[in-house]
Amino acid sequence: MELNDLQAQRAAKLAELRAAGLDPYPPRCYRSHTIAEALAAFDDLVAQSTTLTLTGRIIGARRIMGKIAFAHIEDGTGEIQLWLSRADLGDEWFERFRDQLDTFDIVQASGVLRCTKTGERSLFVRELAILAKAINPPPEKWAGLQDVEERHRQRYLDLIVNRDRREIFRARARVISTMRRVLDERGFLEVETPVLQPLYGGAAARPFITYHNALGQNLYLRIATELYLKRLIVGGFPGVYEIGKNFRNEGVDRSHNPEFTMMECYQAYADYHAMMTLVEEMLSEICLAVHGTTTITYQGRELDFRPPWPRIAMATAIADRTGIDITQITDLDALQEAISARGLRVERKASWAKQVDELFSEFVQPHLFQPTFIIDYPVAMSPLAKRIPDRPDFTERFEAFIAGMEIGNAFTELNDPFDQEERFREQLRAFAAGDEEAHQMDEDFINALRYGMPPTGGLGVGIDRLVMVLTDQSNIREVILFPHLRERSDE
């Protein structure tokens, strides 16, 4: 790669360091304390005149004032000022700092802690070493990398110059670790299921397709973990969960990324009511772990995670917002006419279930800001959920919504192998009619159900969207370290 002028200047300094017999990228380093540890013990270390060694990246502008120089370093735990003098450091290394080191270089500094005359806690440096010479300079606007797409494309640079963004991903880690703790404490077993699958299922989505050369067969990146996890319930595990990546060949927008992280769990001898309780308790505990409270602000509005959350039947929610009663309009053309009368366009070939989904997404979902359960979905929208006994056209299914986004999806799981087989056949008919997101026929899963699956509650939670809410981010790309991006226009 060709270097620009600033990179060339830094490369020349790199050559000077090597010519002086120094390795600008040594294999080892030493530090006695992290910066956070040094600052926490500052008074004691000053009182004892302890010599300590810190490491970190030079951030901000270096200041050279005759025989004295200043710089700040940070190591991921904290930030501290380096105070360097020609008298303490010696001519050679003082001039090396002045002439050959730059912002973004990573250094090792030894000395003692003191406060400057202005009261700033500082390391008064007596020895200095280079650990990594940075060839790329900081972006022109040091206050932050301004271009949003470039921040996502060069996440490493984003994390250097916008250090507050690291807190988003620390919060994400707390979300996942707390989720694991909650499930482990409730007796769920963490398992791993295949990412490459011969059939795709467990969700309405288009898959990514790949090919296994040795086996000579098409494989799919999983769109959900559901069908394998339910096989484990059949096998005798009382409760299982998996946290991992799913992949859906769909559009990219503020709440969708083709590669995303899901938690799915299944509990034997439970139903969707038990899953609602689990969601309320788990997400309120997660919110408490991240923020120390169950009441937070998202995009300027207050959110309250405390249980119990409202429960609203889907048909009721749609009727309240649109006046359309989906329990009465079962004819496809009649439903499309009613939807069109309210200004919503849907494809002529869209199925009844797809039209209801579009209707709900347009008129109801944006209003679900507080944590809310939408329950009792039509059976046509829920091919893996158990029917409500006295309302067989609807299922024991709910979705959890927060801030207008679907965060969770859960069922009382369908365990009747004959009903499941017929649902799959209905999905095949939908696929033949043009629904590219319809389920495949999974005969092995039906065979598993024939051995008997106990009454089971199942739940999926979208971790990326949950992190969005808990870190007050309006775009899913801000909570994924390396989100999917289009190729550069100049590539």
Swiss-Prot record:
It is found in: Cytoplasm. One of its GO terms (cellular component) is cytoplasm. GO terms for molecular function: ATP binding; lysine-tRNA ligase activity; magnesium ion binding; tRNA binding. InterPro entries: Aa-tRNA-synt_II, aa-tRNA-synth_II, aa-tRNA-synth_II/BPL/LPL, Lys-tRNA-ligase_II, Lys-tRNA-ligase_II_N, Lys-tRNA-synth_II_C, NA-bd_OB-fold, NA-bd_OB_tRNA. Binds 3 Mg(2+) ions per subunit. Belongs to the class-II aminoacyl-tRNA synthetase family. This is Lysine--tRNA ligase.
